[in-house]
């Protein structure tokens, strides 16, 4: 699984330069990092479930997950400062491209009634975020090892500042966006 990075360097960069009319190759948009995160929600109080969530994300990403803690107390959500509220992993370079390739080729096709990911996940600054409802679409996750079914948010951070260039980059990399009706 090393093909996506070389595909980007050999083919995608040339197409981006042509379609976006960018002369300087250093200004071409590129994928900088992918952040996978999970909010524990109601399960935040149970440390065993938090450990299980972190372990699941670690399996999916191929890198150790960090348990995120609350920055301040919120009485309405029954959260205290310093309490574990989720887990996240930041992927860069080789692991990032391996994860993206696995996501595109293996995991997303396993989603029931999959018609493409939404085009509405761009934030206006060239970053794209989408959610996955269930972690079982990843081949590393074994059903018997799961304590609680949870989804995850996947954020792709690009080097560009506008959504049009980021969309073109992700589309050329092979992300299956939903068709416009």
From Swiss-Prot:
- Which cysteine pairs make disulfide bonds? none
Instruction: Read off the Pfam families from this record.
Output: Ribosomal_L5 (PF00281), Ribosomal_L5_C (PF00673)
Q: Which UniProt keywords apply?
A: Ribonucleoprotein, Ribosomal protein, RNA-binding, rRNA-binding, tRNA-binding
GO-annotated biological processes: translation
Determine the domain of life of the protein's source: Bacteria
Asked if the keyword tRNA-binding belongs to this entry, the reply reads: yes
- Annotated signal peptide: none
- Which PROSITE patterns does the record associate with it? RIBOSOMAL_L5
The family assignment reads: Belongs to the universal ribosomal protein uL5 family.
Q: State the protein's purpose.
A: This is one of the proteins that bind and probably mediate the attachment of the 5S RNA into the large ribosomal subunit, where it forms part of the central protuberance. In the 70S ribosome it contacts protein S13 of the 30S subunit (bridge B1b), connecting the 2 subunits; this bridge is implicated in subunit movement. Contacts the P site tRNA; the 5S rRNA and some of its associated proteins might help stabilize positioning of ribosome-bound tRNAs.
Query: Which protein is depicted?
Result: Large ribosomal subunit protein uL5
Q: Which organism is it from?
A: Helicobacter pylori (strain J99 / ATCC 700824)
């Amino acid at each position: 699984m090393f093909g996506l990075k070389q595909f980007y360097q050999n083919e995608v960069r040339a197409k981006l330069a042509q379609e976006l009319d960018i002369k300087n190759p250093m200004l071409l948009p590129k994928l900088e990092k992918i952040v996978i995160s999970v909010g524990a929600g109601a399960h935040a109080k149970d440390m065993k479930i938090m450990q299980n969530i972190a372990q699941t994300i670690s399996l999916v990403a191929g890198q150790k997950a960090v348990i995120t803690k609350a920055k301040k107390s919120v009485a309405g959500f029954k959260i205290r400062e310093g309490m574990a509220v989720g887990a996240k992993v930041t992927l860069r370079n080789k692991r990032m491209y391996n994860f993206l390739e696995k996501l595109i080729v293996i995991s997303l096709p396993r989603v029931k009634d999959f018609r493409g990911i939404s085009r509405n996940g761009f934030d206006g600054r060239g970053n794209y975020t989408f959610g996955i409802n269930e972690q079982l679409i990843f081949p590393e996750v074994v059903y018997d090892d799961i304590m609680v079914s949870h989804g995850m948010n996947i954020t792709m951070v690009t080097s560009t500042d506008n959504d049009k260039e980021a969309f073109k980059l992700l589309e050329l990399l092979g992300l299956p966006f939903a068709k416009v009706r």
